[in-house]
């Protein structure tokens, strides 16, 4: 909780109100306790950001060779936690007359890969779950949207993503720079606010235009240059 406490302290010093609370996203009781504790502390719940995810690269391989235990653990972490976050938050939002739910998915939800079968499949489930929640509770003024980050320069990415992969992502981004954590934070803030009150069931891709490129484009450009 050290980093969370530091963030909460900074918010409080700047005139806001914040508390840091423990959560084990693999345990539904922990998720429920977090939401109940939040309501007990602040009186109500208007917004929830289900922001959790991850995988074990050594075990999350192709469909034949991946670890089956990692498949179940990955789904428990990446989508079950989101489902329970929605499930336990919605009744409180119903009492308030509405609310906003933001789920973090990933661009891996939309693209096949040679590895990370569990991660991509479970994050794809988050996209679908987001639409279902939006459809089921929209008439009660509860919105549900998702954010799909590309490669974002979080501390984990800075320290663990190989430099050649960072350079590769940058090469194929439509924009000339990497994404930063604030790019995700501002998107979530928009979806949490009334400025997005007519948006629901959507997944906002925050990925610098990396995936809009035609994968054959580099070869086509090289071919065209060779013909000159």
Annotate each predicted stretch with a short phrase:
Residues 1, 22-34, 68, 182-183:
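The beta1-alpha1 cofactor-binding region of Rossmann-like NAD(H)/NADP(H)-dependent oxidoreductases
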Residues 32, 55-72, 95, 115-118, ...:
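Conserved mid-core segment of classical short-chain dehydrogenase/reductases
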Residues 46, 64-83, 98, 102, ...:
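Catalytic Tyr-X3-Lys loop
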Residues 86, 122, 130:
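Active-site helix of classical SDR
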Residues 91, 135-139, 197:
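Alpha-helical segment proximal to the catalytic Tyr-Lys
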Residues 106:
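Residue(s) in the substrate-gating loop at a strand-loop-helix junction
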Residues 111, 200-228:
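Short C-terminal tail/terminal secondary-structure segment
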Residues 146, 167-195, 199, 206-208:
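C-terminal helical subdomain
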């Amino acid at each position: 909780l050290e980093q969370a406490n530091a963030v909460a302290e900074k918010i409080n010093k700047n005139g806001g109100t914040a508390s840091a609370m423990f959560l084990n996203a693999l345990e539904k009781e922990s998720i429920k306790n977090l939401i109940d504790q939040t309501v007990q502390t602040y009186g109500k719940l208007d917004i929830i950001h289900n922001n959790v995810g991850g995988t074990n690269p050594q075990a999350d391989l192709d469909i034949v060779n991946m670890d089956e235990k990692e498949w179940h653990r990955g789904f428990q972490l990446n989508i079950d936690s989101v489902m329970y976050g929605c499930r336990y938050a919605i009744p409180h939002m119903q009492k308030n007359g509405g609310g906003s739910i933001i789920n973090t998915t990933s661009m891996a939800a939309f693209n096949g890969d040679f590895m990370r079968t569990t991660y991509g499949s479970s994050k794809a489930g988050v996209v679908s779950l987001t639409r279902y929640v939006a459809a089921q509770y929209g008439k009660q003024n509860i919105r549900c949207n998702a954010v799909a980050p590309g490669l974002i320069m979080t501390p984990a990415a800075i320290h663990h993503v190989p430099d050649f992969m960072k350079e590769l992502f940058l090469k194929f981004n439509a924009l000339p720079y990497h994404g930063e954590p604030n790019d995700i934070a501002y998107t979530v803030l928009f979806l949490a606010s009334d400025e997005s009150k007519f948006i629901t069931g959507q997944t906002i891709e925050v990925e610098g235009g990396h995936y809009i490129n035609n994968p054959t484009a580099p070869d086509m450009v090289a071919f065209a240059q060779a013909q000159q």
